[in-house]
Structure formats: C-alpha cells, structure tokens
C-alpha cells in the first residue's frame, strides 16, 4: 500500500511532525507461507520454534512469528532479489505514519477503540489470526493489522544496548498497547511467539 509523501504527526505523548518520502508498505504482516517459501528456496537454517511454525499448515495464512531481527532482514534481502526492487523493513516513522494516516489517529481506524477491528486481549482470540482477518481495522491508506495480532520488527538503528524496536502490539496486549504510537525495545536475537514483521518496497527515487 502506498505511504504518500508528506508531513505526519507522530509520537507517544510528546508529538512531533515528520516529513516522509513515498514508499510501498505491506498491506499485511508477512505470512508464515511466505517465509516457508523463502526458507525452501534458500535452504536457510531456522530455529526449532520457527521450524515448527513453518510446518503448521493451519497457520500458513497467519503472520509468521518466532523470527529474529536477522531472519526478517534476510527475508527482505531475498525478496529484493526476487522482485528486482529494494525491499527492507519499514522504519519506525514510516510504520507509524502508515498506521495513523494523515489524520494522526490513535488506532488505525480512528480514535475510538473497537476490539472487533483487531486482535488483542479485549478481542478474546488468545492467539494469532489470519493476516486478512480484520479489513475493517485498516488504516486510512489501506494497511491492515497494524494494531495487535503480532508485534512487528522495524528497521530503526539499534539502541546503545544493541536492542531493536517493535511496533503495533500483539494478541497479548490490551487496547493501550496496540495504539499506533506504541513502540517497545526488543532483543534482536530473541524470537518470540508474538513478533513478526512487515516489508517496505522503495520507489526508484527513495533512499
């Protein structure tokens, strides 16, 4: 889905305005089936937890989890070769702008929480759901599941401790935790059952 160029209101608490360039951001988080295609094509070794996830056919259309930051980066590199275009993780500002839209919404669909539009604690699912399960929870630009279901790695630089950042909250987070502005530090080498990722495809004139 296109993230249009412009100035976006961002931030949790103290808001700021960021000017962003145009990119294509994934409509959904990357599904398990896509990562299985990647590992089958490349022969890349994976952790035991991720291996079990990839073998679970009933979750092929769920967002992949149990992926480290390096797993996500390697998938992007493979996808770039397959597509012949630059592919990477969304930067934090891009991710938040795609979720909040030009309106600067609290949740992707608006400023009033609705557990029927996402997968979080209040929704009652207790596990991941298919990536296309909540079209009614889409952001104004069309990206879906940017609130809940799984946290998503973003491509911001590591902090002083080497930790990376995840965005969006998961099925284990409450309404407050799945706000568009929500971000958490995460150990890049520790995959979890609540973390996946989403890709960005750059236009030819983006850096």
Feature annotation, model-predicted:
Residues 1-49, 67-70, 148, 203:
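A short glycine-rich, aromatic-capped structural motif
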Residues 3, 52-193:
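Functional-site microenvironments in short loops/helix caps that host divalent-cation chemistry
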Residues 24-26, 78, 154, 200:
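Residues within well-ordered beta-strands of beta-sheet-rich folds
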Residues 41-45, 78-88, 205-207:
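Surface-exposed helix-capping loop/turn segments at secondary-structure junctions
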Residues 10, 173, 206:
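Short, acidic Gly/Pro/Ser/Thr-rich loop/turn segments
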Residues 194-206:
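Short, structured beta-strand segments at or near domain termini in extracellular proteins/domains
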């Amino acid at each position: 889905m296109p993230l249009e160029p412009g100035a976006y209101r961002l931030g949790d608490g103290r808001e700021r305005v960021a000017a962003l360039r145009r990119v294509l951001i994934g409509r959904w988080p990357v599904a398990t089936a896509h990562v299985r295609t990647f590992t089958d094509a490349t022969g890349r070794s994976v952790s035991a937890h991720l291996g079990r996830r990839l073998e679970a056919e009933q979750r092929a259309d769920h967002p992949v989890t149990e992926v480290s930051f390096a797993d996500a980066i390697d998938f992007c590199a493979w996808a770039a070769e397959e597509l012949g275009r630059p592919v990477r993780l969304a930067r934090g500002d891009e991710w938040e702008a795609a979720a909040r839209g030009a309106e600067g919404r609290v949740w992707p669909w608006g400023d009033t929480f609705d557990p029927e539009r996402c997968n979080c604690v209040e929704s009652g699912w207790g596990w991941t759901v298919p990536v296309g399960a909540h079209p009614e929870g889409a952001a104004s630009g069309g990206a879906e599941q940017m609130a809940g279901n799984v946290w998503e790695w973003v491509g911001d630089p590591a902090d002083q401790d080497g930790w990376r950042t995840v965005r969006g909250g998961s099925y284990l987070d409450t309404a407050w935790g799945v706000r568009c502005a929500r971000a958490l530090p995460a150990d890049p080498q520790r995959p979890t059952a609540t973390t996946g990722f989403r890709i960005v495809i750059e236009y030819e004139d983006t850096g």
